[in-house]
Amino acid sequence: MATTLDNPPISVSKIAIIGAGVSGIAASKQLSHHNPLVFEASDSIGGVWRHCSYNSTKLQSHRRDYEFSDFPWPQRESSEFPTHLEILDYLHSYAEHFDVLKNIRFNSKVVEIRYVGDQEDLSSSFGGLPSDHRTPLPGHPVWEIGVQKNNQSDSIQWYAFEFVVVCIGKYGDIPKIPEFACNKGPDVFKGRVMHTLDYCKLDQEAATKLLEGKKVVVVGFKKSGIDLAMECAKANQGPQGQSCTMVVRTPHWIVPHYRIWGLPFSMFYSTRSSQFLHERPNQGVLKALLCLLLSPVRSGISKFIESYLLRKLPLEKYELKPEHPFEEDYASCQMAIVPENFFSEADKGKIVFKRASNWSFWSGGIEFEDNSKLEADVVVLATGFDGKKKLKSILPRPFCSLLDYPSGLMPLYR
């Protein structure tokens, strides 16, 4: 639905914020003197903590590293790794304390963003960004946002803004689904196939019913897959319980807690001095040289942590030792805290690991590249989300082209 003279864009604020998750409500608080308008597609704040969490989901970072600097966690004696429900309570307390809820329009899904500023301001020297980006508020609207209310796809209201803050995140909304050859996909499987995004929508009773007494296969070995395997093991206790098989292509480093040989984890990666060990974008020649000179120290720290993890966890026993150094997973946020008793359930046979690079479906389960077959009733794809596709779906050109980074990673400010 295009903007026309009969349907001109509404201008109610200078600044728009898309998303009311952690970043969205923080941005709203910081920009409160501009009375920003926040568009949230769902009926509540919280983002992934509300829509992409299991019953057992907990924070992966220490509580003190996740709280807002201007709003300490109210219950200081609570768990160091709060549950997703405790995090939602904290976010609601933050939003109420700083009165940001008044700026949020719920059930308002942004479906398109347009840049309507002077096209001559598009400067190749800034990677295709308009030169206005150096003056955040140019004094006149340069962005138009199309919004659907209450999932009414036939009706789009347009709004005009001087500045837009995109806080929709990388995770949720668009699942990353593997591609399969003809007659090798989910359509030939007689059981149930779902992505973790769909599993998150189940309440505890429905989730237990789905897993209990079923042969479950979880594809993936990152945090969502590990948590799901643990929930499956809990639902299948007793002699009638079935085992859960995790299909692992690339093992990633996992940690039991945030202490290494008795030393706090933050000592290795969260101090001011440790920042000199790691490369950063646009860091300059001198800092790059210093980082190069300190690379043996960086490697030594990584091996020191790996030695602890290999001693503490049975990674080699289950062929789950990663081939890459620990620092790679830490730097790319692919490290996960393993749930308590996870390997105890593996020792009891409730969680089984299967290493495989390629697999496909057959009528009774999944088949591997060596032609071996695994029977299954339920297959859950813990294969992540397509954050790049999610952003490209609303960003206009040339801005969406900035997501196509040579390394394949999504370039973020921090």
Where are these regions (language model features)?
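Active-site-proximal cofactor/substrate-binding loop regions of enzyme domains
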Residues: 215, 231
